[in-house]
Amino acid sequence: MMKEKSQVMDIDRSIYDIKDVENDTYRIKSGLTPEIIEKISKEKNDPIWMQQFRLQALQIYNEIPTPDWGPSLEGLDMDNIATYVRPNTKMQNNWKNVPQDIKDTFERLGIPQAERKSLAGVGAQYDSELVYHNVRSEVAQEGVVYMDIESAMKGEYADMVRKYFMKLVTPRDHKFAALHGAVWSGGSFVYVPKGVQLSIPLQSYFRLNAKGAGQFEHTLIIVDEGASLHFIEGCSAPKYNVANLHAGCVELYVKKNAKLRYSTIENWSKNMYNLNTKRAIVEEGGTIEWVSGSFGSHIGCLYPMSILKGDNSKMEFTGVTFAGSGQNLDTGAKVVHVGKNTSSFMNTRSISKSGGISTFRSSVVVEKSAKKAKSSVSCQSLMLDSESRSDTIPAMDIRTKDAAIGHEAKIGSISGDSVFYLMSRGMTEEDARALIVSGFADNVSKELPVEYAVEMNNLIRLEMKGSIG
């Protein structure tokens, strides 16, 4: 029996596939050795404790095996990855001072416009270093700290960075956490003081331009008691015919009665291995909200984790994944209930077409101490043709009888009746299908600020654009 072919073409990535001429100040040789780690540390003028941390992380990396579950990582050879590439500029706090070639790339991606319209602060990283970082004066006056993490580590906030850095995600967590600990570079540090509630978001944008390189930024956010923050992360890269790697790390500390929303729109190119690690710990009465849109990369392994440590703490995860030709996106979320009366809710959508593979993994752990915990997991999958694949892999470890846990999963395809109805109202078949898919992913887009919801819906329309039949 002949397989049904996808009726849509792959994404038109022209805006994201801008390839700048590589004009780097320094590119370390490919591979992973103690000598390379020492060179990175020297280039970055690390404090002594960080030099030692990097070398210890490398040792752990060499001890830990590559994961034997999930998508195959055989195409990723660290001997061919340059782990540090410094662009041709120092970090600027005035957009006018950013070199024109780098500025042109970010301007095409809409970063300056977004800052002017709707953001309290912006960080822009190009390859291994931040090239721009700025925060509105009225936000800084409230005591909010938003700066590159390396300046924080060497300056006024050195003790705070050292206290929290890779304590939530340790190098021993898994092989790529250890890799991150050895070669990390760039990223942001955020501290929101007690009681400060930011009404507009902060954003960091990560752009990997260098061919055959890796990006390993570290984001550390501390939202103090009674404070609130919305942080947005965006990512993109041009496509090359060799593997690129993204293995960043995000550590989020949500204090008593604080609230943090962490939103991500990832549109890496389809030669990218995206092996990011994100984790939050939530104190009494605190709330962590994850909003995630994954549209790019060749291989993706993304499972944000939340530890609900305090009583009455909450977690919500809302995500959409779109896997097209040549993509294997293995995503999901994890939660550990520790405190009493804690609650978690996962609501995800996955879309696959043209032979794409999407896998949703959920992990719910309820400790004995987590009396009256509540957890609900919902995953819906939409396959646009018979070439594609969608899997749901739930895992639950419930150690108390005093908990309410639920899980549901649905897999389906686009209804011909729905397409016919929309076409009878004047739509083309292509537009009808795109509208249905956009509606399917509405759980994420409605949670984003309008500018980012528009970007996400544009990505969906681009994925669906193409000839019919």
Q: Where do the model's predicted regions map?
A:
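Extended intrinsically disordered or low-complexity segments
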Residues: D12-Y16, K340
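N-terminal amphipathic, basic helical "cap/leader" segment at the start of enzyme domains
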Residues: E4-Q7, I11, Y26-D173, A177-A178, ...
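Conserved beta-strand/loop scaffold segments within soluble protein domains that form the structured core
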Residues: Y132-N134, E138, E142-M427, A441-G469
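Short, Lys/Arg-enriched, disordered terminal segments
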Residues: M1-K5, I468-G469
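Short acidic (Asp/Glu) and glycine-rich catalytic loops that position anionic groups and cofactors
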Residues: D17-K19, P34-E38, D397-I398
